[in-house]
């Protein structure tokens, strides 16, 4: 629908999407928004910053806040991620707790559920991976927490996605649009480019060093965008480069394909020892 033809916004608000690490929050946000807005991989803690995805649903402006997964803090980075989640959660109109149907309700889910308000919502996700009886058992355990509504959903099959989207939109408070028409992602362009590059590395490197890698745009002009890829050890630099630079080249090609509206990319790998424990480095990276 052309933004000029859309009905005026009558409801608007923020929904903080929360859950433990690696339960499919980012995939769910993308499905609810109807587009690939946040980075997704099978690695825990793929999301390292809160990403606001704006979706128009009828006369409602639904802002989905994809938050980092909740895990025990073991370095400065993970401690900061936890504080970000708390801040986004406190500032949202609603919270949506995501529970993996395979994992079920564990200690982490019970901890998060204890903080939910009666107006919040829970969803059992990835239901395509388990039998229906398992889904119902997880749902029954969640229902012990008094919430506004409970859902089941599968990003792969699409089951439950439209129902959840419609409910979240209808539950928003009355209010005007929070963003200009056509804005789909509240994220600086340099941050978006760095996140796309990082996602491509996650896909290429699989289990080798996902948590030790960070990306940052160092310079931007009409002639090109330079992205610095940080690792913590010289041995990791060799992995990121690949034999004869093939991994780095493949990542650059794939990222450029997704970012074809942007200037040409240049990737440079730099060793920054223990950057996840350095407050100064995390500040520089905007984390």
From Swiss-Prot:
User: In what residue span(s) does the Era-type G domain sit?
Assistant: 11-174
Which PROSITE patterns does the entry link to? G_ERA
Classification via Gene3D superfamilies: 3.30.300.20, P-loop containing nucleotide triphosphate hydrolases (3.40.50.300)
The cysteines covalently paired via disulfide bonds are none
Where is the secretion signal located? none
Q: Where GTP is bound, by residue? A: 19-26, 66-70
Q: Which gene encodes it?
A: era
UniProt KW keywords = Cell membrane, Cytoplasm, GTP-binding, Membrane, Nucleotide-binding, Ribosome biogenesis, RNA-binding, rRNA-binding
Read off the NCBIfam families from this record: era, small_GTP
Q: Which family does it belong to?
A: Belongs to the TRAFAC class TrmE-Era-EngA-EngB-Septin-like GTPase superfamily. Era GTPase family.
Q: How does it assemble?
A: Monomer.
Give start and end of each KH type-2 domain.
205-273
> A Gene Ontology MF term for this entry?
GTPase activity
The membrane-topology field of this record reads: Peripheral membrane protein
- Its name, as the record gives it, is GTPase Era
**A GO term from the CC aspect:** plasma membrane
* Pfam families reported in the protein's UniProt record: KH_2, MMR_HSR1
Q: Which species does this protein come from?
A: Acidimicrobium ferrooxidans (strain DSM 10331 / JCM 15462 / NBRC 103882 / ICP)
Gene Ontology terms describing biological process: ribosomal small subunit assembly
> Where found?
Cytoplasm; Cell membrane
Q: What is its main location?
A: cytoplasm
- Outline what the protein does: An essential GTPase that binds both GDP and GTP, with rapid nucleotide exchange. Plays a role in 16S rRNA processing and 30S ribosomal subunit biogenesis and possibly also in cell cycle regulation and energy metabolism.
């Amino acid at each position: 629908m052309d933004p000029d033809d859309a009905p005026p916004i009558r409801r608007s608000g923020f929904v903080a999407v929360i859950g433990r690490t690696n339960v499919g929050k980012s995939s769910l946000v993308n499905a609810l928004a109807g587009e690939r807005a946040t980075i997704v991989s099978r690695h825990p803690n793929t999301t390292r910053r809160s990403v606001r995805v704006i979706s128009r649903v009828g006369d409602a402006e639904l802002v989905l806040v994809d938050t980092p997964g909740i895990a025990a803090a073991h370095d400065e980075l993970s401690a900061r991620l936890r504080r970000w989640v708390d801040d986004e959660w406190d500032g949202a109109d609603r919270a949506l707790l995501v529970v993996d149907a395979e994992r079920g309700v564990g200690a982490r889910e019970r901890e998060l559920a204890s903080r939910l308000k009666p107006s919040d919502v829970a969803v059992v996700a990835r239901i395509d991976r388990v039998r229906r009886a398992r889904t119902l058992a997880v749902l029954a355990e969640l229902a012990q927490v008094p919430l506004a509504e409970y859902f089941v959903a599968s990003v792969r099959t699409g089951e439950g996605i439209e129902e959840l989207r419609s409910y979240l939109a209808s539950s928003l408070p009355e209010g005007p649009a929070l963003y200009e028409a056509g804005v789909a992602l509240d994220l600086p362009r340099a941050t978006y480019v760095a996140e796309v590059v990082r996602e491509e590395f996650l896909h290429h490197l699989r289990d080798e060093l996902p948590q030790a890698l960070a990306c940052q745009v160092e310079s931007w002009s009409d002639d090109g965008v330079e992205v610095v890829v940080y690792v913590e050890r010289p041995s990791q630099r060799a992995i990121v480069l690949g034999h004869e630079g093939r991994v780095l080249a493949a990542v650059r090609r794939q990222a450029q394909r997704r970012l074809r509206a942007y200037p040409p990319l240049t990737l440079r790998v730099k060793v920054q020892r223990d950057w996840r424990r350095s407050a100064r480095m995390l500040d520089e990276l905007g984390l």
